[in-house]
Amino acid sequence: MSENGLEQEVTVEEKNNDVTEKILVEGEKSKEYEETPRKVKIVKRKKQPARKQIETRPEYEMEPEQPGQVYNLWYNKWSGGMRQDPLKSQVKSETRCVISRDSGYTKADKNPGSFFCLYFARGMCSEGSKCEYLHRLPKDTDFFNANVDCFGREKHADYRDDMGGVGSFLRQNYTLYVGGITPTDDIEEIVSRHFAEWGDIERIRVLNSRGIAFITYLNEANAQFAKEAMAHQSLDHDECLNVRWATTDPNPASQARNQRRLEERAANAVKKLLPKQFLLDLEETKNGKSGNRKRKLELEFGLKGYVPSDDLLYADGANSVHNQLAANEFPNKSQSEEGSNDDHKSVTTTESQNKFVNSQILSDLQVAKQAVHTNQSALVSYYDSDED
């Protein structure tokens, strides 16, 4: 594309779900064919808008047919009267979510703290990019209150008897129970391939003879998303899966592993909030090198026995102690080569901008440290008789 003697080149790079456009603009060439430096303008935008999975949403979410006499609001079914096996009455879902094809940006991306679209997880959202909920997979940075799931549905104090539904807010459950799998020799590979689409998996335990699998995710939100996405779906043999929450494993080794995982998650969350220098100091203290750190601080400040407070030592940005000391030691290498007068001015300017470590204060403290304490004379003098 050329306009007014300018040439424009557009380069598109794809990375994750974002597209980076690099626009290279060449200046007007002179008669001597001297080229000016090209300007690079980087424009980042989302890869694609969310896709409409279906045209119109089926209105099947109505009250079920009345096979009994009393309607139970908690279980959303009728009780009494006719009895039927709930596992045999399950119907395979006609829609399924495909992350690589259906995910994209929606109106919810502009609102921090938005929930995920339940119909998107089930593969039946008809809103597309106009949806007010997120159309993507949950990430580690997505946090929600303990009383709601990633779709915004309220949790209950206890699980249902069939371990279905939203779940309980008294326990963080990362494990799904998947039944109705066709027993094969490669059942573990099939389960891993289908369920790895919804997030990072920590471990998979498969019972080949019974067609049952227990899948543990690293993130609870991914487990919630996978439960809704794989409910009434099939793997490779046209079966209808029964996806439920897993009960507590009575194995002591499993309980210890869950406790260790919770402690690691809490430690990682705290580490992200602490300064890097503070983490390095903790590591040195753990290895028995706290004395070296104290001596290093004394040498940096030039004051024996002086250790700054944690608020001063671990301040972030340009106000940190280490940045202030580095500014005092290396004000400007390029100006130091030109002349000593310019160096003196740059050091003075840097010291005047120092908020925490002032050179005048340090010099006064060093003078006070070197002061010699003389013995004071007594108030009453005593004379010996020999002196007379």
UniProtKB/Swiss-Prot annotation:
Region feature (Disordered): 43-63, 331-352
GO CC field: nucleus; post-mRNA release spliceosomal complex; Prp19 complex; spliceosomal complex; U2-type catalytic step 1 spliceosome; U2-type catalytic step 2 spliceosome
Keywords tagged on the record: Cell cycle, Metal-binding, mRNA processing, mRNA splicing, Nucleus, RNA-binding, Spliceosome, Zinc, Zinc-finger
CDD domains: RRM_cwf2 (cd12360)
Coiled coil segments of this chain: none
Main location: nucleus
Domain RRM: 174-248
Start and end residues, zinc fingers (C3H1-type): 111-138
Keyword DNA repair in annotation: no
Superkingdom, natural source: Eukaryota
SUPFAM superfamilies: CCCH zinc finger, RNA-binding domain, RBD
Subcellular localization, as worded in the UniProt entry: Nucleus
GO MF term set: pre-mRNA binding; U6 snRNA binding; zinc ion binding
Gene Ontology biological-process entries: mRNA cis splicing, via spliceosome; spliceosomal snRNP assembly
Subunit structure: Belongs to the 40S cdc5-associated complex (or cwf complex), a spliceosome sub-complex reminiscent of a late-stage spliceosome composed of the U2, U5 and U6 snRNAs and at least brr2, cdc5, cwf2/prp3, cwf3/syf1, cwf4/syf3, cwf5/ecm2, spp42/cwf6, cwf7/spf27, cwf8, cwf9, cwf10, cwf11, cwf12, prp45/cwf13, cwf14, cwf15, cwf16, cwf17, cwf18, cwf19, cwf20, cwf21, cwf22, cwf23, cwf24, cwf25, cwf26, cyp7/cwf27, cwf28, cwf29/ist3, lea1, msl1, prp5/cwf1, prp10, prp12/sap130, prp17, prp22, sap61, sap62, sap114, sap145, slu7, smb1, smd1, smd3, smf1, smg1 and syf2.
Similarity comment: family membership: Belongs to the RRM CWC2 family.
UniProt free text on domains: The C-terminal RRM domain and the zinc finger motif are necessary for RNA-binding.
Function text: Involved in the first step of pre-mRNA splicing. Required for cell growth and cell cycle control. Plays a role in the levels of the U1, U4, U5 and U6 snRNAs and the maintenance of the U4/U6 snRNA complex. May provide the link between the 'nineteen complex' NTC spliceosome protein complex and the spliceosome through the U6 snRNA. Associates predominantly with U6 snRNAs in assembled active spliceosomes. Binds directly to the internal stem-loop (ISL) domain of the U6 snRNA and to the pre-mRNA intron near the 5' splice site during the activation and catalytic phases of the spliceosome cycle.
Protein name, per record: Pre-mRNA-splicing factor cwf2
Organism: Schizosaccharomyces pombe (strain 972 / ATCC 24843) (Fission yeast)
